[in-house]
Amino acid sequence: LTSVWRARGLKPVFLAMICAFGAWALLLPVVPTAVLDAGGSETLAGLTTGVFMLFTVVTQIFTPMLLRKVGYTTVLSVSAFLLGFPAVGYLLGMSAPAVLTVSAIRGVGFGALTVAEAAIVAELVPIRLLGRATGLVGIMIGLAQMIALPAGMALVQRIGYDAVYLIAGGIGLLALVACQGIPPIPPPTEKSSETDHIHVPMWRLVLVPALALMFVTTAYGAITNFLPASMRELDAATGATLGGLMLGLMNFASMLSRYYAGRVMDKVGQPGTVMIRFQIISALGVFVMAGILFLDLPVWWMALAALLYGTGFGAVQNEALTMMFYRLPRSKTSEAAAIWNIAYDGGTGMGSTFYGMLLTTVAFAPMFGIASGVIVLGLVVTLLDRQLGRHRVVEVNNLAARLQSVQAPRRYNRGGKKRSGGQ
C-alpha cells in the first residue's frame, strides 16, 4: 500500500468525520449566541459547550471498553445517531434545563464517535503512512469546520435559529449513513503478548502531549464561543457574521498545518519535532486577538490573529496524536485515541466554561490575553519534557519500535521489493 486513499474503508470513515464535525461545528457558535439573544447569561452560554464537552469527555473514557465489547460498527452507528437527531431538541427553547439536556445527549454521541473514528484510522492504515493519514484526518475535520462554523451564524441571519437546528440534526444523521460503509473491524483485544506487559503508567507516556493539546484547546473553547460576540463590539452591524468567517479562516489554517505536521512526522520518522514552534505561534495568535480588541483596531485585523492561532492549533493537534500513538503499545490504540480526544474536548469544554464565567468580571480583551497565557503554560511543559529527556517510550510493540523495524529494511533496500510494516 503506497497511498492512504487506497486503505480499505478509509473513505467512509472520512465522510463520517466530515458529517459529524460539520454537525458539531455548525452549532458551536450558534447555541451560545442563541442563549445570549434569548436573554440568557454569559455563564449559561458558556455552559452549553461546557456541558456538551463534559459528557463528551466522560463518554470518551469508556469508549475503548465499548469498542472491545461491541466493536467499531455498533459504536459508530449509535454515536452518530445520538449526535444528530437530538439537535432538534433545541427547538424546545433556550431555557437552562432544555438546552443543557440536549447538549449532554449530543455530547455522548460526539464523544464515542470521535474516539472510534480516530482509533479506526490507526487500524486501517499502515504505520509508515500514519502521519499522513492523521494529517488527512485534520483536513477532513478542517474542511467541515471551515464550512460549518461560518455557515452557522450566516444561516441564522437568513433563516433563523430553528432551521439551523434542523439542518444540524440532518447532517449528524448523514454520519450514521456513512458509518454503514465502514468495513467490520475486529474489536481491540484486551489481551496482548507478554512483551506488552511493561509496567509503565500510561499517564507518564501521554501526559506531555495531552497537556500541550489541552492548553491550546482551552483557547479554542474561548474563540469559538466568544469571538463572534467580541467582534460585535468592533463592528455592531457585521461583527458576528465576520466572526464566523474568522472561525472558518482559522480552521482552514489548522487544516493545512495539521497535514504539514503529519508529512514531517512520516519524513523524520518520529513525531514532536515541530510541536514547540507551533505552540508559540498559537499563543501569539490569541495574544494578537486580545491586542486587536484592546486597541479597538479595524475588524479585518482579526484575520491575522485567526491565521496565526489556526496554524499553531492544527500542527499541535497532529503532533499530540502521533506522539500518543508513537509512545503507547499497539494494543492501546483506542486508549491513545481516547486520551487525545479527552484532552482536546476537555480543554475546549473547560475553556468555554471558565472563560464564560470570567467574562462576568472582565472584558473580552483581557479574557483572550489570559487564554494566550494558558497556552504558554503548555509550552513550558513541553520545553521541560524535552530538556529532561526522551526516555518515556515503551520500546516494545509500540509504534516507535515498529517504525524502527521497517525503516532499516527501507534504508537497506530501496528497490521494489515488498516490505513489512503494514497493518
Question: Predicted regions: what is each one?
Answer:
Residues 24, 105-117, 308-320:
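Core transmembrane helices of Major Facilitator Superfamily
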Residues 1-7, 184-209, 399-416:
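Juxtamembrane intracellular "pre-TM" segments in multi-pass secondary transporters
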Residues 30-42, 225-241:
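Short amphipathic helix-loop junctions that connect adjacent transmembrane helices
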Residues 53-61, 145-146, 251-255, 259, ...:
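Residue-level signature of mid-helix packing/kink "hotspots" within the transmembrane helices
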